[in-house]
């Protein structure tokens, strides 16, 4: 391989490094004594070599060097061409291909150079005055916060002994279940700064319900004693599911970037389609940096809740203003109509010069429903988002709740949530909702939707009787629907060719199922089934197409849990057994034997005196013949049945049991992984098998080990310096 110049060689090595996942540095170069031209150059990984520092250094800085040998050595031939003299490929550390753009050597500053007058920020200029920093991958954004000593005193505020309590909690949870994930962040002074964790069931829930995630900071912003933030989703029973917890030191871009990165690693790199947050510039910058493909939306209820704090003379014209504002927000059919009404509104109430109103308009695509066509919030919008999120911890977290009390309540909260979901699953298996009309839409969705969603959809079907529609024009596809229930008119656009329907009430966007206005238009158009693209799988009984099964029999001690466990195993057995005639024969044989043994056991329990007779006369309820083919008579010994990596038989080893205290032992209902994860269980890094493709460990978000933890547990932290981005008002 040849290069025209040594700079071309370095660009090649940089491109290679970015694709593999490490940062680069120019290690050395040499010039000819005669011609003064470069004749030799060596490029390396940024972790090449070892740290050299004076013993009397006042403010020692962390160094990334850990003795890595990866490098490329190039030399110049007499004809002027450069060639590779030596190349070392192996690294002594993990590579980060997904996060490679964060390395200093891979950040593109061309946009800054070409647009210097708009993007360059003078020293001490507030970050809120900077613009055009949305393309974080292409700008030197993260390093733009400058490595300085601003974060030296920032740490997680804890009471005496809380650090040990927190560490013990994290290690116990991971000991109970190896798929429990956690990560910690330390300052350069070895102070505990940020903590993140998510339980095994939260990771499994995210696989099925990753479309919409709410990031909740109300406890943190309200200055609770426990600086708690939450990642929350919603399952197919419209129950909140906890997708991660964080304890944060401050409200800065750095903190939120670290948190989002840690959460993304825990979730195997799977990014949500939509993330709902409160209006916050630091969170906005972090999501744009870590989750650029995710649609970031503000909670509309939170936006409206800020009106009294940001507008003068609010009480003088509150009713009139809100009426006009709601008309603009909820009754604007198009983006142009929204803009027109907004400008008319701020002129009428003399709000053009109010900075908050200007910023609100500039960010209208983050919160205004008119700009969110095609997005589904799964019910996590408006006030119901706040109520759903707060319902997780409202019984366990109060302003003065200590960390110890919170961790104890955490186990109880998990137990409550798992019981509620198990009960809803049981109801779904055990009974069907009642039909309340002869509507074909109701019959269609009876066994498709989960019970809670069906009941809500059923109200829309019944409400269609109170709607009257008129066509806006003979040639058009837009209908005006008068809803006599709320005395409002709605516009419905129906494209029969594309099976695309849209209502101005935006029920589908907010809730994930069609409204009564859309239903009456479909009905009057001769369409009597809900178009498939408006039946979200997340709301159906098939939301989890492969159920997690508990291997520990101690987790299945009630009729409800036993019933759910057997039903889920039967589904997996059906999937595997139907793949071939041989697997079908094996499954049938196993079921026959199971029926016989169950009959004997039940008869023994009911009639102990006749147990021997019951064992002989127990019938076989399974038909002998396979209606799809012949059944083999030579089955052989009972096999071990597997579904993916899920063993059918219980593990022989005893799983270690522990709990936070005597009152939270039942928190062990966390769904157990069916694959033993790989990674350190002795330190702060663990990524299980399903997520190894990311090649990222939680420990990579750490810096150095504080003394308070060194005697408690063996750790293997890598000394990676943190980028200091401690500003809570980043460019927007």
Swiss-Prot record:
GO terms for biological process: regulation of DNA-templated transcription. Residues 623-683 are annotated as: Disordered. Induction: Up-regulated in hypocotyls by far-red light treatment. A zinc finger (SWIM-type) spans 490-526. It is found in: Nucleus. Belongs to the FHY3/FAR1 family. Residues 11-97 form the FAR1 domain. Residues 212-308 form the MULE domain. Its main location: nucleus. Keywords: Metal-binding, Nucleus, Zinc, Zinc-finger. Signal peptide: none annotated. The gene is FRS4. GO terms for molecular function: zinc ion binding. Residues 624-635 have a biased composition (Polar residues). Putative transcription activator involved in regulating light control of development. This is Protein FAR1-RELATED SEQUENCE 4. Expressed in hypocotyls, rosette and cauline leaves, inflorescences stems, flowers and siliques. GO terms for cellular component: nucleus. It comes from Arabidopsis thaliana (Mouse-ear cress). PROSITE patterns: ZF_SWIM (PS50966).
